[in-house]
Each structure stands twice: as structure tokens, then as C-alpha cells.
Amino acid sequence: MTDSSWPTDERPRERLLAHGAQSLSDAELLAIFLRTGTTGMPVMALARHLIDEFSGLRGLMTASRRQFLQVKGLGTAKYAQVQAAMEMARRVMDEPLRQGDPLRSPADTRRFLTSRLGTYPHEVFAGLFLDNRHRVIQYRELFRGTIDGAAVYPREVVRQALEDNAAAVIFAHNHPSGVAEPSQADISLTRRLKEALGLVDIRVLDHMVIGHGEVISLAERGLM
């Protein structure tokens, strides 16, 4: 069932066109994306059900294929649509930090790292490797772990930085819990990495911790 049987001013698509996408709820945006419901469940009811089932849009958009297909009425076609939408959003966020471009602002860096790391259900430690003019050489996800943490090996980080001929690096990792507050272990690791890279004249500019809707800079906190 579609939304065509609703009063015109209550249909999500018409409300979007009249008032803008920002005026719609998460469920209404999802209903437009889904287009149709399932047998016995109109599209808005399905959208609300999915928001509840996955605890919000973030949970839905980052669900694994197995989790997604466990929900009645969702198939591989819808899963492919979700993945395509996620990748398009990620590429838009990536545009300010393409290879060879200089870092324009801390805000661009935050947005880029959030788009890359903010949706993982497990911890990922990454590096943004830069040349001596702070132009992007490469973004690399260096270590992956569990929901509780990822093991990081300074020797491997130094090797990768030298291989990329980097002059500076910005580190980042996500907290799957959603709380971006850096731990004492995060601070200690940053200082160890800074010391190890300093031996080969590579500067550590920052280490950012990515939560849900929040990014904390250890450099801004004076914790480097």
C-alpha cells in the first residue's frame, strides 16, 4: 500500500515538496524512501515499525544484510537501496577531503571522519596522512576491533606513515557506545604514537574521538 489514499496535505512526499525535507519526521522520510508498504502494513506504519525495530535511522542504515533481511517485507532490493543511499551520502561528505586537497577547516575534517567512522558497530582506528602542506595523501583504516576496543600497534602506524611519505597525520577512532569522551587509554595511546612518529619527524596534529553526533579533539583539549 502506498500513501496515495491519504489526504494530499498529509502525504510525506507532498509535505516535503511544500515545506522542505527538514520538516519531515524520520518515519516520513523513510516512508518516501520505501515507497510502498507490505501486505497488511501501509508504508507509514512500516516506516514507524522499522524506526522502532532498529532504534532509529542510524541503526537501520548501518544494519547488516542479515539483520535487514530478518524484517518481514524487506528484501535484497531494499537493502541495496539503503547501501546506495549510505554510499552517496558518504561520498558527498568526502568531497572536501579528496586526495591532494589541503585541509580547509577543522569542521571539514570532523565531517569527513564522522562520515567514515561514525556508523561502525565496532571500534575502528584510522589515520589521515598528510604532506608537509597538510594536503591529503591518504585516509587509512589501520586497525579494527570489537565494540570494546581495537588494538593499535605504533610500529605498524610508523611503517604506514613512512610508506605514504607523510609529514603529518591526524588520528581518529570511533566509540561504538556513542559517547565521544576520550578515555585515559586513548590519551596514553596518542602520546605513545606522537613519540614514536616524532622519532622519524612526522607530526601528530590531532586525535579525534567520534561518537554519535559529537567529535572530541584531543588537541583542543590539550591532551596531546
From Swiss-Prot:
Zn(2+) binds at H173, H175, D186. GO terms for molecular function: metal ion binding; metallopeptidase activity. It comes from the Bacteria. Disulfide bonds: none annotated. Keywords: Hydrolase, Metal-binding, Metalloprotease, Protease, Zinc. GO terms for biological process: proteolysis. It holds the Pfam family RadC. InterPro entries: MPN (IPR037518), RadC_JAB (IPR025657), RuvA_2-like (IPR010994), UPF0758 (IPR001405), UPF0758_CS (IPR020891), UPF0758_N (IPR046778). A motif (JAMM motif) lies at residues 173-186. The keyword Hydrolase applies. The keyword Protease applies. Residues 102-224 form the MPN domain. Belongs to the UPF0758 family. This is UPF0758 protein Maqu_3564. It comes from Marinobacter nauticus (strain ATCC 700491 / DSM 11845 / VT8). The lineage of its organism: Bacteria, Pseudomonadati, Pseudomonadota, Gammaproteobacteria, Pseudomonadales.
